[in-house]
Curated annotation (Swiss-Prot):
Family: Belongs to the GatB/GatE family. GatB subfamily.
Source taxonomy: Bacteria, Pseudomonadati, Chlamydiota, Chlamydiia, Parachlamydiales
Function according to Swiss-Prot or TrEMBL: Allows the formation of correctly charged Asn-tRNA(Asn) or Gln-tRNA(Gln) through the transamidation of misacylated Asp-tRNA(Asn) or Glu-tRNA(Gln) in organisms which lack either or both of asparaginyl-tRNA or glutaminyl-tRNA synthetases. The reaction takes place in the presence of glutamine and ATP through an activated phospho-Asp-tRNA(Asn) or phospho-Glu-tRNA(Gln).
Enzyme Commission (EC) number: 6.3.5.-
Protein name per its UniProtKB record: Aspartyl/glutamyl-tRNA(Asn/Gln) amidotransferase subunit B
Pfam families reported for this sequence: GatB_N, GatB_Yqey
Catalytic activities: L-glutamyl-tRNA(Gln) + L-glutamine + ATP + H2O = L-glutaminyl-tRNA(Gln) + L-glutamate + ADP + phosphate + H(+); L-aspartyl-tRNA(Asn) + L-glutamine + ATP + H2O = L-asparaginyl-tRNA(Asn) + L-glutamate + ADP + phosphate + 2 H(+)
Organism: Protochlamydia amoebophila (strain UWE25)
InterPro entries: Asn/Gln-tRNA_amidoTrfase_suB/E, Asn/Gln-tRNA_Trfase_suB/E_cat, Asn/Gln_amidotransferase, Asn/Gln_tRNA_amidoTrase-B-like, GatB, GatB_C_1, GatB_Yqey_C_2, Gln-tRNA_amidoTrfase_suB_CS
Length: 494
């Protein structure tokens, strides 16, 4: 059973969306055992008796996982519970060797909280319901004639971040999830690698008529390992539900949409039914008898709160207020901690923050996109980009030449731009004003109509003249000098 994506929607309806974000914490060991918490190793090598649920094995709580959960709670201004406990969530599946998951049901470690995200250029607040600790399941792998289970992931520490049903569009859902990801990376709680499963997102979606109170039956969607797939899946499901209600205007709501779990098939671009939705009763929650409650002191929580690093929103506001970056530039830089850190490092030797931002967000990504790389993955030192911008600022090279130098920097990542410029005669600036004047005179002699148009107030005509001069001198002349000479000579023409 599947549902093809098509464009929604109906103006009388609104979506109600809640997200459950599962985050694998980057602790050295697992949540309840000393087994390594590491992705990509040979199957079933990072396991102990606790991971595989052997009789007599007992869990021991990883205190670093608790600390990271508290860090996140403090980062979103939530209430960190001084008393929380673990529970067993029972279900039967091959990747769960104990036939239950250790999670937190009614007394989670974090309650409430607020996440501020940028949606269409504006800040919007989203409410978090809870954050709880739990251990991960193993991985079921299907082969041609059999299925195998890799328990390396079993027991890895997770926090599940549950939002309130306060999200109403796919764009809001993506913005909220990206803000969560950025916070987690800034506090070093997780690498949030969606391809490796460090960040997994489930969405709960229902629709209702605008102004209607209460919630209708919801659909859960799993298997969204990118933000673009997530946005597509949500759009698809919103449209499906609206069409279902419009097609059956007289039927009771709960007979039109039944609670169920779907998965997103990225190849077919459609949602596929997995199973009818279970209720909390189906999981038979009860307190975990082998673990004592988590009891935290005020001083422990406050110490973690005071040790928080600068968070994405704080850094974004600093970039706009102190550096004069646009809101878009600041958001784009701070959404990726590695990129923001790279920017900060380059700023130590670069005088122009706006120019640096433009090169990091536009010029270099455009050159690296085809190879799926970025400035860090090709080992391009921050000081080299700073050096390139400084060469432009000093007038040593023009912006056009800088782009050619950037091409060589990408091709030879370890080479300093000053060295590249010094070794190529074509990159030497044209400082002879008399020679530049000859180019200007030639362009003016060949483009009388552009002179007439410029005098008539058409700025594009002047830009064309500048471009022609720069073309003749192969981009080596100073644009400001070319501008000055053109204006002087045009003013003196009869």
């Amino acid at each position: 059973m599947s549902h093809k994506y098509s464009h929604p929607s109906h103006s009388d309806w609104e979506a109600v969306i809640g997200l459950e974000i599962h985050v694998e914490l980057n602790t050295k060991s697992k949540l309840f055992s000393v087994a390594p918490n590491h992705f990509g190793d040979e199957p079933n090598t990072n396991i102990t008796e606790v991971c595989t649920g052997m009789p007599g094995s007992l869990p021991v709580l990883n205190k670093e996982a608790v600390r990271k959960a508290v860090q996140f709670g403090c980062a979103i201004q939530a209430e960190v519970a001084k008393f929380s406990k673990f529970d067993r969530k029972s279900y039967f599946y091959p990747d769960s060797p104990r036939n239950f998951q250790i999670t937190q049901y009614d007394q989670p470690i974090v309650k409430g909280g607020t996440v501020i995200a940028e949606v269409n250029g504006k800040e919007k607040s989203f409410a978090v319901n809870r954050v709880h600790l739990e251990d991960d399941a193993g991985m079921l792998k299907h082969f041609s004639t059999f299925a195998g289970v890799d328990y390396n992931r079993a027991g890895s520490p997770l926090i599940e971040i549950v939002s309130e049903p306060c999200i109403h569009t796919p764009e809001e859902a993506v913005a909220y999830a990206m803000a969560i990801k950025a916070i987690l990376q800034y506090i070093d709680a997780s690498d949030c690698n969606m391809e490796e499963g460090s960040l997994r997102i489930d969405t709960n979606i229902s629709v209702r008529l605008k102004g209607e109170q209460g919630l209708r039956n919801k659909i859960e969607i799993k298997n969204m390992n990118s933000f673009s797939f997530m946005e597509l899946a949500i759009k698809s499901e919103i449209n499906r539900q609206i069409q279902a209600y419009l097609s059956h205007p007289t039927k009771p709501h709960d007979q039109i949409i039944a609670q169920a779990t779907y998965r997103w098939d990225p190849e077919k671009q459609e949602t596929v039914l997995m199973r009818r939705k279970e209720s909390a009763d189906d999981y038979r929650y009860f307190p975990e008898p082998d673990l004592v409650p988590i009891i935290l002191t005020d001083s422990y929580i406050e110490e973690i709160r005071q040790s928080l690093p600068e968070l994405p929103l704080q850094r974004e506001r600093r970039y706009t207020k102190e550096m004069g970056l646009s809101a878009h530039q600041a958001f784009a830089l701070t959404s990726d901690k590695a990129l923001a850190d790279y920017f900060e490092e380059a700023l130590k030797t670069c005088s122009n923050s706006r120019s640096l931002s433009n090169w990091l967000l536009v010029e270099f990504p455009g050159r690296l996109k085809e190879g799926g790389q970025n400035v860090k993955s090709i080992n391009l030192p921050p000081s080299h980009i700073a050096s390139l911008i400084n060469l432009i600022e000093k007038g040593t090279i023009t912006g056009k030449i800088a782009k050619s130098v950037a091409d060589e920097m990408v091709a030879q990542p370890g080479k300093d731009p000053a060295e590249i410029v010094a070794g190529n005669p074509d990159y030497q600036p044209l400082n002879d004003q008399n020679e530049v004047e000859r180019y200007v005179d030639q362009v003016l002699a060949e483009n009388n109509q552009s002179i007439v148009d410029y005098r008539a107030g058409r700025d594009k005509a002047f830009a064309y003249l500048v471009g022609q001069v720069m073309k003749l001198c192969k981009g080596k002349a100073s644009p400001s000098l070319v501008n000055e000479l053109l204006k002087q000579k045009i003013a003196n023409l009869p």
